Amino acid sequence: MRHPLVMGNWKLNGSTHMVNELIAGLRKELSTVDGCGVAIAPPAIYLNQAKHELAGSRIALGAQNVDVNLSGAFTGETSAEMLKDIGAQYIIIGHSERRTYHQESDELIAKKFGVLKEIGLIPVLCIGESEAENEAGQTEAVCAKQLDAVLNTLGVKAFEGAVIAYEPIWAIGTGKSATPAQAQAVHKFIRDHIAKQDAAVAAQVIIQYGGSVNDKNAAELFTQPDIDGALVGGASLKADAFAVIVKAAAKAKKA
């Protein structure tokens, strides 16, 4: 049985004070929660501080991006080996903001996926369609293309122990969210697409929902059979709201 994972993507938010305060709040709110994996991805500059603040807790450390290179003349980048060295486990790749603002291609993201697997880190592969693609009925085609970039270069076994986050771009930071039924349909398509090559791999892969998940809509989303937690943006910056989402995932998947 799949173990749900709720991960907080802090994006470009944080300060030394906020890291201390938010993690203290999370530790308090989540101290008794069982049955749901939890991870946070602060900005890279705060990873070491977050690692120390998380010590002894069950909250895993994540990161928001990685470079394809392990070392060398790549100013401003962070390698998979560095992330592993500092204690990060879950690494977000392919987020729509990276695809849009940094023109990251499916091919580059597949390379990042491969590097993370090679180093022993867990890729959190973000896929999803824009509003125009959604309205044109291209959701499944877009998701398939983004998955195939990994499947065709690394093979289906690469998804063993990996995480996929379906993030409809039109729902990120907009307050809009897919209905539970809409989200479930896409999550099922993603799992079925992988199952065409290996049903066992498809059955174990965690597929998070990442489109404006908050403390109000989480419980209903998590009742869906193929939604295995969430990649949370804005709500992950508030300990109480994030805790509601984690608790909803733990409760729904225990039922």
From Swiss-Prot:
Q: In what pathway does it function?
A: Carbohydrate biosynthesis; gluconeogenesis; Carbohydrate degradation; glycolysis; D-glyceraldehyde 3-phosphate from glycerone phosphate: step 1/1
Which sites are catalytic?
A: H95, E167
The cross-references to PROSITE patterns, in alphabetical order and at most eight, read: TIM_1, TIM_2
Name the major location: cytoplasm
Q: What is its EC number?
A: 5.3.1.1
- Residues the entry annotates as binding substrate: N9, W10, K11, G173, S212, G233, G234
Question: Which keywords does the record carry?
Answer: Cytoplasm, Gluconeogenesis, Glycolysis, Isomerase
Question: What SUPFAM superfamilies does this protein map onto?
Answer: Triosephosphate isomerase (TIM) (SSF51351)
Reactions performed catalytically:
D-glyceraldehyde 3-phosphate = dihydroxyacetone phosphate
- Compartments (UniProt record): Cytoplasm
Is the Ion transport keyword given for this protein? no
Record GO biological process: gluconeogenesis; glyceraldehyde-3-phosphate biosynthetic process; glycerol catabolic process; glycolytic process
Provide the GO MF annotations for this entry.
Answer: triose-phosphate isomerase activity
**One GO cellular component term noted in the UniProt record for this chain:** cytosol
| Function of the molecule | Involved in the gluconeogenesis. Catalyzes stereospecifically the conversion of dihydroxyacetone phosphate (DHAP) to D-glyceraldehyde-3-phosphate (G3P).
Instruction: Tell me how this protein assembles.
Output: Homodimer.
Give the family, as the similarity comment puts it: Belongs to the triosephosphate isomerase family.
**UniProt name for this protein:** Triosephosphate isomerase
What is the native source organism of this protein? Yersinia pestis
